[in-house]
Amino acid sequence: INFDYEIEAKAFGGAGIDASGHPLPDDTLAAAKTADAILLAAIGSPQYDKAPVRPEQGLLAIRKELNLFANIRPVRIFDALRHLSPLKAERIAGVDFVVVRELTGGIYFGQHTLTENSACDINEYSASEIRRIMRKAFAIARGRNKKVTSIDKQNVLATSKLWRQIAEEVAKEYSDVTLEHQLVDSAAMVMITNPACFDVVVTENLFGDILSDESSVLPGTLGVMPSASHSESGPSLYEPIHGSAPDIAGKGIANPISMILSVAMMLRDSFGETAGAEMIEHAVNKTLTQGILTRDLGGLANTKQMTAAIIANL
């Protein structure tokens, strides 16, 4: 595996606020728009919790600016870490699925009204927004076990009625892929009682936010889960799913695996370097199997030691 790359670092989140007063500085956005891919570090700090400008606002902004409509979160459980899962071994056997979350529509981007005695949040989706996220999910399923579970609240919400209608229409374009529907409350239960039944899960922004976080509980740690966010034609963004962990800042003990696996996703999805991605994933698995674990995994390795072990196993 041999290819050239160039890394350019830009301020974002809290660093962006400190540098320019905005979590997504203009020069950072300009660089992101011209990049081949974006690797995003974890953001957030207690110092901004009550501030009018917060690091998390930069996430919503960059998703909208780059039209990152599809968030992809793989969920798998490493054999060496099965003991960390809060579920019994038989419940997590065979768990390997992907959550596909619509990321730029829905209630998070609707109109928000707050008065002293009432509040209103508008949840709106167009057919085109639903259709493109469905096609993304079906395309992913076609390369896996050919099953899509579409999650909605069709028995109550108008947006979910449209969601289910478009799902059925898109399913006709992928005759080799099976489509099933689940209501979100039922899906939340099944994700704990029988998570191995899922292959590709697709849902709207709010439901996806909740269910993807629920799925992250299955491996027993946030430290080994990567994610990607894709646009239709621009650069994709890759990031670990965990936060910035300010309580251990500067101690050098953070688990680097989520970021390393995010790099593997970047190699595969943005650069077409499938062999390189698989090498990284195999190296991570081998390292864990060897019993080299960071503190959040019950071991003693620090960040640099874990990273060095993974590199050695490449």
Residues covered by each model-derived region:
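Short acidic loop-to-helix transition motifs that present clustered carboxylates
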Residues: 13, 80, 182-189
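Short, glycine-/small-residue-rich phosphate/pyrophosphate-handling segment
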Residues: 77-108, 124, 128, 243-277
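N-terminal beta-loop-helix "entrance" segment that forms/cooperates
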Residues: 2-26, 191
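N-terminal glycine-rich phosphate/adenylate-binding segment common to multiple enzyme folds
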Residues: 18-123, 206
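Glycine-rich phosphate/nucleotide-binding loop
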Residues: 14-17, 191-292
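Glycine-rich phosphate/diphosphate-binding loop of Rossmann-like nucleotide-binding domains
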Residues: 1, 116-185, 197
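Flexible, glycine/charged-enriched surface loops at secondary-structure junctions
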Residues: 2-6, 144-152, 174-182, 272-281, ...
